[in-house]
Amino acid sequence: MFAAQYIGNKSFNVVEGHAIAPQAGEVRLDVGYVGICGTDMHIYHGVMDQRVSIPQTIGHEISGVVAQIGEGVEGFTVGEKVVVRPLDWCGECPTCEAGLTHICQNLKFMGIDTPGAFQSSWTVKARTLHKLPAGVDLKQGALVEPLSVACHDVRRSRLKAGEKAVILGGGPIGQLVAAVAKSVGAEVLVSEPNDSRREFADELGVKSVNPMDTDLAAYVDQWTGTKGADVVFEVSGVLPAIQSMTQIAGRRGRIVMVAIHSTAPPIDLFQFFWKELELLGARVYEAADFDWAIELIASGQIDLKPFISSVSPLADIGSAFANMDGNPQGMKALVECNAEQ
């Protein structure tokens, strides 16, 4: 088997090794495709070197095929297509005992804190697996993880049909949030300065606006008939969006924090009092979000094919990262880890 190891300084080594036989409760996968995530790009830029052990095999947006099953594992057979929910929770802390394993107090994120998926063979705990139905191929399967992020965001927002949602930021996650929001019957507006990303939103069938040349608050006021947005998703991670989110939310609107802000941004707390706003955090996903994401793909409600910008072999992972780094128009780059599949 081969694995791509991040070695720092925007560099990878592809090394040959041995597949790890599954222990009790584990399954070994032949990895199909792995998506390059925004978090992977942060690692690539060295932002997370203090957290990520170097060298490390990163990657967590993965589809694959069951190759070997460990003792005690039930419900899976060799040859089945699966995806991995890349969270390793302790099961013992108060948060896990409350059923919130995705925000476990001792959570390890696979592909960041522990070895990840940019390898041809990956052995994981069976509890992290979700099956793919026959109609969902491995390329689409590699996007189940980011789609699950969007499903969790929308589920946290309590968004319903007929409501109006504004998404601040039209990157891959923002566009997936737009797609999920549209699937529940909401009217959707994506605020994004990048021309190609606004075009992508338009092709998804949602509205878009450039906040750099349009007064966003005035635009939303007109779009909603002065009511304001029912839900605002902050997906950009930039300060202007933080300033806008409280302005454009309507009375008793819900604001969902999706982006990670590295420094504490100033927030207009007066608007929370004046409008009775809600601020909701949304971190990763739960099992139900993976199930929902798979159903959205299998039912045809969301087509993920337009999100795939490129596919590269594992041997060319360095070029795949470099190309994504220089392509702000790109959505999702996939790395193919077993070309024969």
UniProtKB/Swiss-Prot annotation:
It catalyses: 2-dehydro-3-deoxy-L-galactonate + NAD(+) = 3-deoxy-D-glycero-2,5-hexodiulosonate + NADH + H(+). This is 2-dehydro-3-deoxy-L-galactonate 5-dehydrogenase. Its EC number is 1.1.1.389. Involved in the degradation of 3,6-anhydro-L-galactose, which is the major monomeric sugar of red macroalgae. Catalyzes the third step of the pathway, the NAD(+)-dependent oxidation of 2-dehydro-3-deoxy-L-galactonate (L-KDGal) to 3-deoxy-D-glycero-2,5-hexodiulosonate (L-DDGal). InterPro entries: ADH-like_C, ADH-like_N, ADH_Zn_CS, GroES-like_sf, NAD(P)-bd_dom_sf, PKS_ER, Zn_alcohol_dh. Zn(2+) 1 binds at residues 37, 60-61. Its cofactor is Zn(2+). Keywords: Carbohydrate metabolism, Metal-binding, NAD, Oxidoreductase, Zinc. The record marks 145 as: Important for catalytic activity for the proton relay mechanism but does not participate directly in the coordination of zinc atom. Belongs to the zinc-containing alcohol dehydrogenase family. PANTHER family: L-THREONINE 3-DEHYDROGENASE. One of its GO terms (molecular function) is oxidoreductase activity, acting on the CH-OH group of donors, NAD or NADP as acceptor. Binds 2 Zn(2+) ions per subunit.
